[in-house]
């Protein structure tokens, strides 16, 4: 899908209620600014390192499926055209509706890895409001750098390690996150470095389940031994 789309993709992953409206306002503002620049024929766009609207695609994947319709309505209230994943017969590049849309809405289940693989950078849902964030290791494993907000307490250690390794960047809020993402999309060298850092971070953090089981094995063996003794004495 990524090669067929042939445009950078900015993803808002596992977005939450209270975050989407601000995201759409930022995307709408970027689109309006780009149209204004084109209308007055200025060179401001060429002087900016950020990718302007019309040269990237915005993908949003809400955390809760029951909110797909509400999220689409929020986007449309900002004058943004929406194309839903469920309406694509194949990939987005084969859908005229998708390629003309301002927002792609990931309204499917079990395809998060596909969405991350399609995207060049992801905003971490749940981190721009006091909701604790989401697990960002899946994004890293797909080679997708992350921009996150201040609220990552549910995954504090992973977020700190990702930030320290260059796989993620932390910003104050959604306006800063969108700008940081667009700047990354406009800087090929920085993007290559971020992708490499993401893959390396994911590789270092694979096998967490195996590590946990190894750590618990002595305890589990002790429990099994006690059960055998209790059964023998019964």
Question: Where would I find each of the regions flagged by the language model?
Answer:
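Nucleotide-activated sugar donor-binding and catalytic core shared by glycosyltransferases
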Residues: 1-234
């Amino acid at each position: 899908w990524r090669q067929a789309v042939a445009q950078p993709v900015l993803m808002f992953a596992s977005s939450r209620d209270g975050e989407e409206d601000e995201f759409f306002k930022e995307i709408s503002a970027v689109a309006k600014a780009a149209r204004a620049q084109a209308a007055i024929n200025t060179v401001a766009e060429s002087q900016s390192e950020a990718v302007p609207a019309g040269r990237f695609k915005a993908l949003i994947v809400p955390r809760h499926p029951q909110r797909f319709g509400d999220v689409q309505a929020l986007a449309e209230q900002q004058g943004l055209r929406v194309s839903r994943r469920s309406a694509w017969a194949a990939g987005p590049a084969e859908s005229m509706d998708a390629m003309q849309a301002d927002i792609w809405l990931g309204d499917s289940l079990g395809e998060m890895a596909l969405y991350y693989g399609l995207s060049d950078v992801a905003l971490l849902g749940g981190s721009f409001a006091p909701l604790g964030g989401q697990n960002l290791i899946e994004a890293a494993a797909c080679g997708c750098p992350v921009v996150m907000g201040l609220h990552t307490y549910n995954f504090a250690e992973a977020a700190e390690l990702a930030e320290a390794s260059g796989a993620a960047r932390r910003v104050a809020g959604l306006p800063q996150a969108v700008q940081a993402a667009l700047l990354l999309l406009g800087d090929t060298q920085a993007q290559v470095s971020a992708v490499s850092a993401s893959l390396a971070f994911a590789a270092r953090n694979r096998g967490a389940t195996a590590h946990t089981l190894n750590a618990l094995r002595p305890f589990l063996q002790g429990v099994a031994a006690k059960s055998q003794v209790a059964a023998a004495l019964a």
